[in-house]
């Protein structure tokens, strides 16, 4: 299934995509649906926590949905599919992205957090605030949505804890993230570089894990104004989805609704920015970006089978 949150009469509603329609789960809920499931049909995190029972009723609702429970997707204002309690991020998870950055040595995934205050949805505007950054960059990333709580989860059992997947643009202020020392080495400051208003577009939907046959075999692309900027496959991750679940669960108990961002491939604007230590990757098929994001740009983050996230950049 594909779950979305959308706006209706000023209120957030939870729906499921079917063809060109959004089916409102509360409106379509079968008679006699348990109160706990009805409550879950108004909150994505509660629906995730309802696990198989919630999914079973959601499927029944979708199958029986009448016209009154349906809204054409084209007439729907989508919001981010979830308001995550925690966004765990892994950087440097594709070799070609590592190659376009100042040299680093790392044996574990890069670990940083992103604020949920920066979450926006499909169709919302990314704000380029010059007081924050002059070098606003894009990063298409696949999101893992945790469905079952766990700590110290072995990679071999990680998929038991994954509810589904989505798309995130890890919007980054490069001139806040990276400072070059006089000797040419770099200092990373991921706090201000990764956390500001509208820094985390997510969506358009959460796709349940049963819809994705192999999360390590999905084409990933980024377009800016129709120009291809990133092109890779999730199969080129250094650490797989299962390994990232194992890694992050070492530190915190993963709860339903927590999301893990799996990193971005090469092709960022940073890779063409010598002032910040950027360098072209050795792979000849990596796209070289022409510039950082500017007001008026349209950014498309696309992962096959997971979704196509579109946002426009505006000036503050």
Please state what every model-predicted region is.
Residues 85-86, 108-110, 115, 124-126, ...:
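Generic beta-strand structural signal
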Residues 151-166:
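N-terminal accessory regions of nucleic-acid-interacting proteins
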Residues 103-122, 138, 295-305:
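Structural signature of FAD isoalloxazine-binding scaffolds in flavoprotein oxidoreductases
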Residues 9, 60, 71-73, 77, ...:
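Catalytic-pocket segment enriched in acidic/His residues
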Residues 1-110, 298-302:
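N-terminal non-catalytic cap/leader segment that marks the start of a structured domain
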Residues 83, 89, 139, 254-255, ...:
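Residue-level recognition of short, solvent-exposed, well-ordered loop/turn junctions
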């Amino acid at each position: 299934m594909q779950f979305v949150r959308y706006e209706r009469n000023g209120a957030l509603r939870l729906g499921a995509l079917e063809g060109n329609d959004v089916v409102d789960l509360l409106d379509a809920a079968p008679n006699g649906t348990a109160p706990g499931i009805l409550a879950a049909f108004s909150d994505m995190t509660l629906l995730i926590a309802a696990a198989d029972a919630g999914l079973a009723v959601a499927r029944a609702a979708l199958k029986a949905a009448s016209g009154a429970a349906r809204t054409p997707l084209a007439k729907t204002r989508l919001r981010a599919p979830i308001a995550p309690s925690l966004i765990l991020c892994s950087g440097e998870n594709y070799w070609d992205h590592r190659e376009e950055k100042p040299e680093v040595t790392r044996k574990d995934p890069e670990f940083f957090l992103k604020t949920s205050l920066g979450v926006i949805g499909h169709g919302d505007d990314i704000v380029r605030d010059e007081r924050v950054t002059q070098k606003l960059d894009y990063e298409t990333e696949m999101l893992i949505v945790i469905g079952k709580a766990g700590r110290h989860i072995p990679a071999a059992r990680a998929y038991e804890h994954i509810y589904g997947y989505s798309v995130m643009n890890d919007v980054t202020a490069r001139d806040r993230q990276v400072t070059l020392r006089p000797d040419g080495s770099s200092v990373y400051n991921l706090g201000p570089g990764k956390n500001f208003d509208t820094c985390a577009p997510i969506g358009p939907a959460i796709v349940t894990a049963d819809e994705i046959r192999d999360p390590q075999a999905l084409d990933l692309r980024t377009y800016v104004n129709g120009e291809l900027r990133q092109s890779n496959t999730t199969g080129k991750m250094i650490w797989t989805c299962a390994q990232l679940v194992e890694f992050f669960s070492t530190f915190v108990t993963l709860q339903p609704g927590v999301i893990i961002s799996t990193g971005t491939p090469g092709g960022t604007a940073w890779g063409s920015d010598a002032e910040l230590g950027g360098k072209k990757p050795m792979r000849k098929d990596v796209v070289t970006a022409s510039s950082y994001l500017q007001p008026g740009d349209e950014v498309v983050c696309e992962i096959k089978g997971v979704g196509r996230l579109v946002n426009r950049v505006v000036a503050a």
